[in-house]
Amino acid sequence: MAVGKNKRISKGKKGGKKKAADPFSKKDWYDIKAPSVFQVKNVGKTLVSRTQGTKIASEGLKHRVFEISLADLQGDEDNAFRKIRLRAEDVQGKNVLTNFYGMDFTTDKLRSLVRKWQTLIEAHVDVKTTDNYTLRMFCIGFTKRRSNQVKRTCYAQSSQIRQIRRKMREIMVNQATSCDLKELVRKFIPEMIGKEIEKATSSIYPLQNVFIRKVKILKSPKFDLGKLMEVHGDYSEDVGTKVESPADETVVEGTPEIVGA
């Protein structure tokens, strides 16, 4: 019986199957360092491809933006609703030095603030700090019932809303233009600006839950390493410590043993 070709039996491909290379074998881990304004300095790690030819690893890391919860940066769960954006500005050894790049609220926190029977008042303004950072700040606030009020609702009139909005802008400009970015971030963490707005507008209409809900950096000055090191404070101490080998230790070489002598 003649043996013909069985077309259903597929032939094996020449060369066999290529072994998949591990993508992580060509990558390195770098530590992310937060500015000294925050309690926790070492906030995480990031991955980048190793330097190959003209592709330098540190260049791939620069201007990378990391979003971190303020609860992790401060070690305080009460601040979990704030998200801080940090941008990589410089790479030193295996450390990525970052700077403040923005702030936002979590969606669930914003949704929990909006309720019935009250007026929501929002304002935003562009400001310039003393160290030439241009920011856009967004403020949010809600009206509340007066202490002796019987009526269920607490709606503000249009004229009162305009007055409150004007006051919000005024305070935001005064607070931001009188300090540098580092000092301004210090004001954001305990919500100092929101408390001041609440106090200043109490004569117009009492407010509650006043927050700087969002901050965007629109324009940054030219990169200055000296300024960045100031922002990171005592960081230089733990960059790398010199390890000296003890002078009195001498390496003793053993005599080679001859097998079968």
Swiss-Prot record:
Stretches for region Disordered: 1-22
Assigned keywords, A-Z: Cytoplasm, Ribonucleoprotein, Ribosomal protein
Domain of life where this protein originates: Eukaryota
One cellular component (GO) term of this entry: cytosolic small ribosomal subunit
MF annotations from Gene Ontology: structural constituent of ribosome
Protein localization: Cytoplasm
InterPro entries: Ribosomal_eS1, Ribosomal_eS1_CS, Ribosomal_eS1_euk
Biased composition (Basic residues): 1-18
Coiled coil location: none
Keyword Calcium: no
Principal location listed in the UniProt entry: cytoplasm
Record's subunit section: Component of the small ribosomal subunit. Mature ribosomes consist of a small (40S) and a large (60S) subunit. The 40S subunit contains about 33 different proteins and 1 molecule of RNA (18S). The 60S subunit contains about 49 different proteins and 3 molecules of RNA (25S, 5.8S and 5S).
Entry similarity comment: Belongs to the eukaryotic ribosomal protein eS1 family.
Name the record gives this protein: Small ribosomal subunit protein eS1
